[in-house]
């Protein structure tokens, strides 16, 4: 089974990807991991990507697509894969379609994890980090035993600047703006599966498995 997973920051996409690949016995292709591996192995596409990254420039689509094509051609993808973190735009999705066609691969479903905006805000702004040892807490899901204090070292907990409401709001709006056309693109192809991410992890997983089987 060949799948693609999407979801805004805070939707639990990473958690679902981890359990899903084990459940379906397919390969997890995270674009971040793929980049690191290609650069480390010194592949042709990895070298090209490194040139751009060293200059602090965005890696062009054709290089990313080249890396995705290399990765999908590897033996561990023959039994199926879960693509995570790519595509991010309709242009990339269209290029991915052409690549899959070249490789004779069919994309079976696109999983889109949906969580209401206010819930995402609560999830993302609730993180607290210990100034002393770096331990991470969450005011709702993993609160410290004593408010504002680390369980391990009694250090002071603080909210990172990129976890405040303004920063989180900007990130979420950017995601929505950028991916709305992508969601429409896959919906038009009839392979989009919208999943309610505002429930227990096991319930979300169950809904995904029902949707893709």
UniProtKB/Swiss-Prot annotation:
According to the lineage, what is the superkingdom?
A: Bacteria
Kindly list the biological process annotations in GO that this record carries: AMP salvage
Q: Name one GO molecular function term.
A: zinc ion binding
Q: Where is this region: LID?
A: 126-163
Q: Where is this region: NMP?
A: 30-59
- Is Nucleotide-binding found in the keyword set? yes
This chain's function reads:
Catalyzes the reversible transfer of the terminal phosphate group between ATP and AMP. Plays an important role in cellular energy homeostasis and in adenine nucleotide metabolism.
**Name of the protein described by the UniProt record:** Adenylate kinase
Q: At which positions is ATP bound? A: 10-15, 127, 136-137, 199
- Quote the catalytic activity from the record: AMP + ATP = 2 ADP
Is Metal-binding found in the keyword set?
yes
One Pfam family this sequence matches: ADK
Q: Which NCBIfam families match?
A: adk, PRK00279.1-2, PRK00279.1-3, PRK14527.1
Q: Where in the cell is it found?
A: Cytoplasm
Please report which protein family the annotation says this sequence is part of. Answer: Belongs to the adenylate kinase family.
Subunit-level organization: Monomer.
Q: What is known of its domains?
A: Consists of three domains, a large central CORE domain and two small peripheral domains, NMPbind and LID, which undergo movements during catalysis. The LID domain closes over the site of phosphoryl transfer upon ATP binding. Assembling and dissambling the active center during each catalytic cycle provides an effective means to prevent ATP hydrolysis. Some bacteria have evolved a zinc-coordinating structure that stabilizes the LID domain.
Instruction: Say where the protein is mainly found.
Output: cytoplasm
PROSITE patterns cross-referenced by the UniProt entry:
ADENYLATE_KINASE
Q: Which Gene3D superfamilies match?
A: P-loop containing nucleotide triphosphate hydrolases
> Might you give the EC number(s) for this enzyme?
2.7.4.3
Ligand binding (AMP): 31, 36, 57-59, 85-88, 92, 160, 171
Cellular component terms per the entry's GO annotation: cytoplasm
Q: In which pathway does it act?
A: Purine metabolism; AMP biosynthesis via salvage pathway; AMP from ADP: step 1/1
Q: Which residues bind Zn(2+)?
A: 130, 133, 150, 153
Q: Which SUPFAM superfamilies match?
A: P-loop containing nucleoside triphosphate hydrolases
């Amino acid at each position: 089974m060949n799948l693609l997973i999407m979801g805004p920051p805070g939707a639990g996409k990473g958690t679902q990807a981890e359990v899903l690949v084990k459940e379906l016995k397919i390969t997890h292709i995270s674009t971040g991991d793929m980049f690191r591996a290609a650069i480390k192995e010194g592949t042709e596409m990895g070298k090209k990507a490194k040139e751009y990254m060293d200059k602090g420039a965005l890696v062009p689509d054709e290089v990313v697509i080249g890396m995705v094509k290399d990765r999908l051609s590897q033996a561990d993808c023959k039994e199926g894969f879960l693509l995570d973190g790519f595509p991010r735009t309709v242009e990339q999705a269209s290029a991915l379609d052409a690549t899959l066609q070249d490789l004779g691969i069919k994309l079976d479903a696109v999983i889109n994890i949906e969580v209401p905006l206010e819930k995402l805000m609560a999830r993302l702004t609730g993180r607290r980090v210990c100034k002393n040892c770096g331990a991470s807490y969450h005011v709702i899901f993993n609160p410290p035993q004593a408010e504002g204090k680390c369980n391990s070292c009694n250090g002071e907990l603080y909210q990172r600047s990129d976890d405040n409401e303004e920063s989180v709001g900007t990130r979420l709006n950017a995601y929505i703006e950028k991916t709305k056309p992508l969601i429409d693109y896959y919906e038009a192809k009839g392979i989009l599966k919208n999943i309610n991410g505002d429930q227990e992890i096991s319930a979300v997983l169950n809904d995904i498995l029902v949707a893709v089987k």
